[in-house]
UniProtKB/Swiss-Prot annotation:
Induction note: Expressed periodically during the glycolytic and respiratory oscillations cycles.
Name by which UniProt lists this protein: N-acyl-phosphatidylethanolamine-hydrolyzing phospholipase D, mitochondrial
Residue sites binding Zn(2+) 1 per the record: 265, 267, 332
Residue spans crossing the bilayer: 54-76
GO BP term, pick one: phospholipid catabolic process
Organism for this UniProt entry: Saccharomyces cerevisiae (strain ATCC 204508 / S288c)
Transit peptide location: 1-39
Class of enzymatic activity (EC top level): hydrolase
Cofactor: how and how many bound: Binds 1 or 2 zinc ions per subunit.
Family: Belongs to the NAPE-PLD family.
Amino acid sequence: MNFVTCHVQMRLLLQRRLVRLRESELFRPQTSLSTFKRHASQKTRPIQKCSRKYARILLLSVLVPYTGYAFYVSLATVKQIDLRNEMCQRLEENNNEVTYKGSLLKYSPLEVLGRFENPFEEYRIQTVFEFFANRVFELFERNRGGIPRDVHQMNKLMPVHKPTWGPNLVDVDPAEETALPLECKVLDELHIPTAVEENEGSKCPVYNTWLGQSCNYTVYNGLRILTDPLFSDFLIHKTLGPKRITQMPSQITEVPKPDIILVSHNHPDHLDLESLEYWSGKDSPLWIVPKGMKSYMTSNGCDNVLELSWWETLQVKKNNEIYHISATPAMHWSGRSLLDTNKSLWCSFLLTHHGNPILFHAGDTGYVKDLFVRIKERFGKGCKLALLPCGQYCPEWHQKPRHINPQEVLKIMKDLEARNVLGVHWGTFVLSGEYFLEPKEKLEMLAEWGGFKDRCYCPELGKTECFD
């Protein structure tokens, strides 16, 4: 009996130990798998270290040469500016006045290493570091631009009108229009007209319709001019990029066919792909662009293109009337990507008729203390209408070399002795830090303080205005 009991107890004990052993094996890490992971991690560590090393080398191989390039460009530009200032000062100190030759010496296009640079003392070169640093700062801004969420409130703040365009253009069907051919030729310096006394030609009214940003439709004496065309809801692509914050006053298909399209530079908010596609091919308007932009235009199907460099003048003849369009300097930059930065020039434009300044389109520019005085001395004072940008100036440390604020708009108005000024380049996209209505409010407040609020203000979208 004792033997049987002992045997049973021994079997029970062995069974319990066997069960415990099996349970422990269920939770015991697999030796082969853990060993494999350990060996795998040991193999990947050198690869990770190597990839980090190559990433650092690649980053340094880009940043170091670019920093050296930017440093060289800055030094070369400053050297050229000093040389030009010295030569201009010697030339003009005997005359005690601003001369056209001095303007050519001081403010002719400047190229460094195959790219255009600004020949202005007021300009500070923008590097890639600054550009992307400002983009990072923008990520932390809340409700940038102060855009109201309520659509009805936005419509009250930014009313949109249906354009009437100008005399006899309300009922015109753009699809049925055929543009009259223009006779054009670039003039040499000896044949460029200078300012003369007022005559019948300068008494024709100017009709202007602001379509957003720097896009304006201007009619003068039957000549139709479109500036910096922009008819897209997004800047970069049809569905990408900063979105338009206001309604478009007119679709591109509703715009009466212009005779001339002026493009101040190739930034996406001054030239969109939709305009290139719509006004290309045969019977397209005459595109007038800065030097270096023609190849981009032709690659997008626009063949009726003429390039102008600073101080060059194009003679245009329509209906036996002769007009002159001159490209004048501006302080800005160009580029639609990082690779083509400053490969083409940027400029402003001045339309003259019978030697009198009619329309000044600034495009984008910073303020230069004697530039606009020199433009006035060359082409005459009393410009009927100056279209000047007044937005995108915050933060000032970043924007000031390339954009003007409302105070500087008034300075340019005084320098040009312009009769009327419209503040544009605001209220269309959020591209800077100021409240979206601030440019309008500041400009009109300063103009009222100066006693000329009826001659200097911001237009309403789509509203066609007449300037005698």
